A protein has these predicted regions:
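Domain-level signature for soluble enzymes in the chorismate/prephenate branch of the shikimate pathway
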Residues: 1-235
Length: 235
């Protein structure tokens, strides 16, 4: 049976294709230079769809596709009802809280603070767990600008190297979670196409172990303690 797979467009796409090729899937008809969004590959029993990363869980949950490849950050934010059997190991980033340099340790968490982010649900859960009242400002890009123009006290964003934060005079206050590419499966497809899905998981897991063992990770840094008191935790 043919598997339909949603791939995240953007910089994760090339890494995803490389993993599939290492797993032995010949994708001759696939071209990232094409404007096409649907790529049938009958020679390997798969059809690929190129979609926005934030749409991948929706396509999978509602059965428009059988399988998807998407970052853990998107899954945490959307909390979709999908089966997540495999961490592919690439695309390592971290979801982090950041603030202007010199203001990171300022005692401003005793009252309501503004936080700009494209991850409102993750942000709300994080600060609620710490008893900090927040006003969340949803942005769709260039999150680093928010503290520079006084729009927000903090930001929650995806960080890979930290260079973008440094370029905007921001420092990482605390890491919320790590994010890597994940394989997710529609729950009905897992039953109806069990053999095909299991074979895909097995092959990708084999090459992902190699990749995971040698990849440059983006680990969570030691916590600086975002707390109501605004004090840092000693390390």
């Amino acid at each position: 049976m043919m598997l339909t797979i949603a791939l995240s467009k953007g910089k994760m796409l090339d890494l995803t294709l490389e993993v599939f090729r290492r797993a032995g899937y010949a994708m001759g008809s696939f071209s990232t230079a094409s404007r096409r969004l649907v790529f049938p590959c009958p020679e390997i029993g798969m059809t690929f769809l190129i979609v926005r990363p934030t749409d991948v869980p929706t396509y999978v949950e509602y059965g428009a596709v059988d399988v998807g490849i998407v970052g853990k950050d998107v899954l945490m934010e959307q909390d979709s009802d999908v089966y997540e059997p495999l961490d592919l190991g690439f695309g390592a980033c971290r979801i982090a809280v950041a603030a202007l340099k010199g203001q990171a340790s300022r005692d401003r968490l005793s009252s309501k603070i503004r936080v700009a982010t494209k991850y409102p649900k993750i942000t709300e859960r994080y600060f609620n767990q710490r008893g900090v009242a927040v006003e969340i400002i949803k942005l769709y890009g260039s999150i680093e600008l928010a503290p520079l123009v006084g729009l927000a006290d903090r930001i929650v964003d995806l960080v890979e190297t930290g260079n973008t934060l440094k370029a905007h005079n921001l420092v990482e206050v605390e890491c919320i979670a790590q994010s890597t590419a994940r394989l997710v499966v529609n729950r009905a497809s897992l039953k109806l196409k069990h053999a095909e899905v299991t074979e895909l998981i097995t092959k990708l897991r084999a090459v992902s172990r190699v990749a995971t063992g040698s990849r440059a990770t983006a680990p969570c840094e030691p916590s600086r303690g975002v707390r109501r008191t605004g004090k840092r935790t000693r390390t």
